[in-house]
């Protein structure tokens, strides 16, 4: 007989492993208890839970891998709320940098080059890295110097923005590229 709920049960057990054990879910016989004022004491699990209940708080296992496990007497709901708030704050402060790519050919017109360099300028101001790619086809491969000239003119046009040349112009197969990144203030 096939157990159709096996995957669901396995997934539930995984999600419970990430959560902290509180009160009667703690399996150890003895625990090191850290009280609200910072003092520590090794107690039996029953005594520790009793002290937590007297204080109107929860016994939360914070470090299960040591012997005896370390537990804190705290308000679990408040603790979990502050943990989630801290994680959201860290996620909000995290800066995600994307790599944008601008493609062109060596036979690009001056107006098109201006338009592409304005796009590159916008990407850099938004805080994204930019990969400028020039694809050579057929006989154009004999004139790679045109690609270097185009890339240099783009760098001159983007010069008024603080940027770092992360990867200088180089050929790879039939394409020439360079990577430009914005300079961040520390």
From Swiss-Prot:
Q: What InterPro entries is this protein classified in? A: T_IF-3_C_sf, T_IF-3_N_sf, Translation_initiation_fac3_CS, Translation_initiation_fac_3, Translation_initiation_fac_3_C, Translation_initiation_fac_3_N
- List GO terms (cellular component aspect): cytosol; membrane
Q: Predominant location of this chain? A: cytoplasm
GO MF annotation terms:
ribosome binding; translation initiation factor activity
- Which locations, inside or outside the cell, does it occupy? Cytoplasm
For this protein, the record's SUPFAM superfamilies field holds: Translation initiation factor IF3, C-terminal domain, Translation initiation factor IF3, N-terminal domain
Q: Which UniProt keywords apply?
A: Cytoplasm, Initiation factor, Protein biosynthesis
Q: Name one GO biological process term.
A: ribosome disassembly
On the tree of life, the source organism's domain of life is Bacteria
Against PROSITE patterns, the record matches this protein to: IF3 (PS00938)
Q: Outline what the protein does.
A: IF-3 binds to the 30S ribosomal subunit and shifts the equilibrium between 70S ribosomes and their 50S and 30S subunits in favor of the free subunits, thus enhancing the availability of 30S subunits on which protein synthesis initiation begins.
- Name the family the entry cites: Belongs to the IF-3 family.
Note the subunit structure: Monomer.
Q: Note the NCBIfam families from the entry.
A: infC
In its UniProt entry, what is this protein called? Answer: Translation initiation factor IF-3
Q: Which organism is it from?
A: Borreliella burgdorferi (strain ATCC 35210 / DSM 4680 / CIP 102532 / B31) (Borrelia burgdorferi)
The gene it comes from is infC
């Amino acid at each position: 007989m096939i157990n159709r709920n096996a995957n669901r049960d396995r997934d539930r057990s995984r999600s419970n492993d990430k959560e902290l054990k509180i009160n009667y879910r703690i399996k150890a016989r003895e625990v090191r208890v850290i009280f609200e004022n910072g003092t520590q004491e090794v107690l039996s699990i029953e005594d520790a839970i009793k002290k937590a209940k007297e204080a109107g708080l929860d016994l939360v296992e914070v470090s299960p891998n040591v012997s005896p496990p370390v537990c804190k007497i705290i308000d679990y709901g408040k603790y979990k709320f502050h943990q989630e708030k801290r994680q959201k704050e860290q996620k909000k402060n995290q800066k995600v940098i994307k790599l944008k790519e601008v493609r062109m050919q060596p036979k690009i017109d001056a107006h098109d080059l201006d338009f592409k360099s304005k796009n590159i300028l916008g990407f850099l101001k938004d805080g994204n890295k930019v990969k400028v790619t020039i694809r050579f086809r057929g006989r154009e491969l004999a004139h790679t110097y045109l690609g270097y000239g185009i890339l240099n003119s783009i760098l001159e046009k983007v010069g008024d923005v603080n940027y770092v040349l992360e990867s200088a112009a180089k050929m790879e197969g039939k394409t020439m590229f360079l990577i430009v990144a914005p300079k961040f203030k520390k």
